[in-house]
Amino acid sequence: MNLEELAERIRSFEGVTRKRQIEDIVSIFETVRPEYGNAIVDFGDDAAVIDIGGDDVILFAADGIWGRLLDASPWWAGYGAVVVNINDIAAMGGKPLAMVDIASANSSKACRELMEGLAEGVRKFGVPVVGGHVHPDTQYNSLSVAIIGIVKRDCVIRSDTAKPGDMVIAAYDMDGKIGPNSPYSWDTTSFKEPAVLRESYLVTQEIAQKKLATAGKDISNPGLIGTLGMLCETSRVGASVDLEKVPRPEGVDFEQWLKVHPGTGYAFTADPERAEECVNVFEKAGLTAAVIGKIEEGSKLDIYDQTGRVTVFDFSKDSITGICSE
């Protein structure tokens, strides 16, 4: 495996490059920054954190489904929209409460399939879709879902709080398979019973309550290295990752695996004295977890193995989202 070529393919991976417009979008809302008084966390994290004046805070997130995936299977788009939203709340250590959707459909068949997929997600995870809006007569299909959750104020797992010296932990549900509509989808939920899924998603709440993580994100479209890159970018730190320590399933190409968006997967950081306990909590919940690297001073995210070491991102000149904590 040529590390230089791997690094370049990660940088140019569509799951990474599609994040770049975020910087321009966020800059528009900086013009109204004084109105964000109740937002403890906003752009750049898996969910916004909203102050409601008590021990609990509201988590608020939204995801839209990529058009090409939606066209391949409206049902899967509906189901997947639930999964990714649940993951956003879980990654912050929270309990998901309810969702709303905005759907557009070019036929009654597509609309029904979208809604049936959403309903299956509700059945699996026990988080209801409580309303929304539908355009039943568009020339295209689209779906966006928003979710709210709740978490104790002092238990929020943010992505901009990693610090040099922290250990990097990757955790995956390995009981999965490549999904039907993308080589970068790792389905770990569609074939499992609701009770199993609901129990497994409590793991991040336990980690949050025990304060085992210093920062974290769910592994999303940019894959493991890209997701860790977003965490480093917002935390204003670098990282080094030992590729040989990354958990991986049998029968999946390793480069493909690094780009996978798993049904259940996390990139967390932890204090060295608590990293092993954090790994153990993931493992007890049925995930495969390992310390794969370390947060470093500086701006470079490096990967290495026995053959050498290369920089994937140098945030002094590169960007993924362009969002950095103040």
Role assignments for model-derived ranges:
Residues 57-58, 65-67, 95-182, 275, ...:
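Glycine-rich anion-binding loops of enzyme active sites
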Residues 1-37:
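N-terminal amphipathic/basic leader segments beginning at the initiator methionine
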Residues 39-42, 135, 219, 237-249, ...:
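Beta-strand->loop->alpha-helix junctions that form or flank phosphate-binding loops
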Residues 1-5, 9, 13, 285-326:
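Acidic, Ser/Thr/Pro-rich beta/coil linker or hinge segments at domain junctions
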Residues 73-100, 113-124, 199-208, 224-230:
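Small-aliphatic-rich amphipathic alpha-helix that forms the alpha element of a beta-alpha
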Residues 269-276:
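Helix N-cap motif at beta-to-alpha junctions
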Residues 194-263:
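Active-site-proximal betaalpha loop/short-helix elements
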Residues 180-196:
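Short, compositionally biased
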